[in-house]
A protein has these predicted regions:
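Glycan-recognition and catalytic cores of secretory/periplasmic carbohydrate-active enzymes
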Residues: 1-166
């Protein structure tokens, strides 16, 4: 029951079916900061974040299987296609966010989370295209984010300018 309630909240408050994708978050703010009343209002962050949507895709695909709800699978795959089509560059991989357009390409978290969502979509559908896309992102991680001393950088050189670095 709790899973159904969480899905209901996400779909009612954070899902935009016209895209289709999930908004960033809902913030709760006190109506009057000078008093300690319980009155508050909410603001929806309508920016679409790749990593958060990828996590939602994985969760909805799991929920579809566990709850026997094909509609959740369809919704997850729709979000996956939107994020892949609108938040990706062939050279730089996944962009971190999308509002008026895609912004902040090449962050490790976005490549990794979207890669996991694509692998999960492959398991849910058997469609090889999802596995091929995950491999594309893995190549970007290795080529653009690998540290020659070991491990990976969380962002590439070209992405640092977005964050104000030289």
């Amino acid at each position: 029951r709790m899973a159904e309630e969480i899905i209901g909240y996400l779909n009612k408050k954070l899902f935009d079916p016209s895209k289709p994708a999930f908004f960033g978050c809902e913030d709760f703010l006190r109506r009057d900061e000078s008093t300690r009343t319980d009155e508050f209002f909410t603001i929806i962050d309508e920016c679409i974040y790749c990593d958060a949507n990828a996590a939602a895709i994985v969760t909805y695909l799991d929920a579809a299987r566990i709850l026997h709800r094909a509609d959740l699978r369809t919704q997850a795959l729709g979000v996956l296609e939107f994020i892949w089509d609108r938040c990706r560059s062939a050279d730089e991989g996944m962009y971190h966010c999308f509002d008026e357009g895609p912004r902040a390409p090449g962050l490790l978290i976005d490549q990794a989370r979207m890669g996991m969502a694509l692998v999960q979509a492959f398991h849910a559908t058997g469609k090889a295209v999802f596995l091929e896309r995950a491999k594309e992102l893995a190549k970007i991680i290795v080529l653009r984010l690998a540290n020659s001393k070991g491990g990976y950088f969380d962002r590439g050189q070209s992405e640092l300018a977005f964050f104000g670095a030289p």
